[in-house]
């Protein structure tokens, strides 16, 4: 393969800690770096680490390290070497994806495609204003995303990191289903789909790629783009953020404590499990010790840095709102919790997601200087549909 050859078929790289996987990570980050900020969700996810034996990186680029070529009809490929290749024609689409089914029911896939940063000029739909060449570009992009979905379908499904919780939920659900006279209607379980191994959660999916998944008809019936709330993606230049404001009297800083994980999960529309929260940098605001005997109580505001380093699970208790605590905790978390992700010569950016319609959070992000860059989605892909493509 010469330096002028286009990207080839998808290859699968293991990300379990090793010298070879570090070389792959370094190469992937080099490819993604010029595409920041659009590539930042995947870029930061790879920086964060927290890889398991079933953590994989998929790409059709030659990253210069041994990899497994993907056979669309088999779950295991044969080993193959590859040679460095860092020059790709603009019209040849490429993607890099992080996939780990161990993390279900939480996000299993982050992906960046070259078309997200530089899409073909015209619509993929045939029309007099859409030249054949552009339609062929979109078809190549669709084919590449379809190949990724098929590759995900053919992965083994490991035991979930949260299997004990999923099993307990299933037992509770079975008991409720057999109760002849339930006294109350149990709340819907947002992670019920996680017990179905063919349903896979893709996160922070750029609106352009979300449209491709919809066009391929691989989204679960309950996770269509048209019926799923999109998210604003806000970007922050951390060095330009003002210093965090001083806390009001009677409050003090701390980290989120494990004993408060259940409270935090109950306040979020996207619950995160204890093992994940324990691995994330966090910041919380507590009643000060000795403050009218309330010291040691639960936090009144909190936020985490997520696996893709976005500010996540940001919450201020209702009785404490209107005092700027959300802005204060976000600013302090960005300035102190992101230190290990900074690199020489790379702009120090942080980001956060706000669901469309949440005007309060959107206003807070804008007041901090956040730039609304693009829309993204969390979507469930039905891997059984991959056979129909």
Question: Which residue stretches match the model-derived regions?
Answer:
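Short amphipathic alpha-helix that is part of the acyltransferase structural core
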Residues: 2-41, 237-273
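Active-site rim helix/loop that mediates acceptor-substrate recognition in acyltransferases
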Residues: 33-68, 73, 262-292
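Acyl-donor-binding surface of acyltransferase catalytic domains
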Residues: 44-248, 378-381
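Conserved beta-strand-loop-alpha-helix junction that forms the acyl-donor binding cleft
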Residues: 201-207, 347-362, 371, 380-387
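Conserved active-site alpha-helix within GNAT-family acetyltransferase domains
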Residues: 208-222, 341-342, 354-374
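A conserved beta-strand-loop-helix scaffold within acyl/acetyltransferase catalytic domains
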Residues: 271-319
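Conserved glycine-rich acetyl-CoA-binding loop
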Residues: 313-328, 345, 357-359
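A conserved short alpha-helix in the GNAT/GCN5 acetyltransferase fold that borders
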Residues: 321, 330-338
């Amino acid at each position: 393969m010469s330096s002028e050859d286009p990207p080839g078929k998808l290859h699968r790289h293991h990300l379990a800690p090793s010298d070879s996987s570090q070389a792959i990570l370094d190469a992937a980050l080099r490819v993604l770096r010029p595409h920041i900020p659009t590539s930042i969700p995947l870029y930061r996810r790879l920086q964060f680490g927290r890889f398991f034996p079933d953590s994989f990186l998929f790409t059709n680029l030659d990253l210069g390290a041994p990899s497994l070529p993907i056979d669309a009809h088999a779950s295991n490929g044969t080993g193959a070497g590859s040679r460095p290749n860092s020059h790709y024609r603009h019209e040849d689409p490429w993607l890099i994806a992080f996939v780990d089914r161990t993390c279900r029911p939480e996000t299993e896939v982050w992906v960046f495609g070259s078309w997200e940063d530089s899409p073909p000029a015209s619509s993929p739909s045939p029309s007099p204003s859409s030249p054949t060449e552009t339609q062929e570009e979109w078809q190549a992009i669709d084919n590449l995303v379809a190949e990724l979905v098929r590759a995900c379908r053919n992965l083994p499904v490991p035991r979930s990191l949260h299997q004990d919780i999923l099993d307990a939920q299933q037992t509770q659900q079975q008991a409720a289903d057999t109760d002849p006279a339930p006294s109350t209607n149990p709340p819907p379980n947002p992670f019920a789909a996680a017990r179905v191994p063919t349903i896979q959660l893709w996160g922070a999916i750029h609106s352009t790629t979300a449209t491709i998944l919809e066009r391929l008809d691989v989204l679960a019936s309950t996770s269509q783009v048209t019926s799923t709330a999109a998210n604003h993606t806000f970007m922050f230049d951390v060095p330009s953020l003002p210093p965090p404001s001083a806390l009001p009297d009677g409050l003090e800083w701390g980290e989120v404590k494990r004993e408060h994980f259940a409270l935090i999960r109950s306040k979020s529309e996207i619950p995160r499990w204890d093992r994940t929260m324990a691995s994330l940098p966090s910041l919380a605001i507590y009643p000060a010790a000795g403050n009218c005997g309330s010291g040691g109580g639960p936090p009144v505001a909190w936020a985490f840095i997520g696996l893709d380093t976005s500010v996540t699970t940001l919450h201020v208790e209702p009785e404490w709102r209107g005092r700027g605590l959300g802005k204060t905790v976000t600013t302090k978390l960005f300035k102190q919790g992101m230190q290990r992700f900074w690199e020489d010569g790379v702009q120090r950016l942080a980001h956060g997601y706000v669901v469309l319609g949440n005007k309060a959070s959107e206003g807070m992000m804008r007041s901090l200087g956040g730039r609304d860059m693009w829309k993204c989605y969390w979507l469930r892909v039905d891997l059984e549909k991959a056979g129909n493509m």
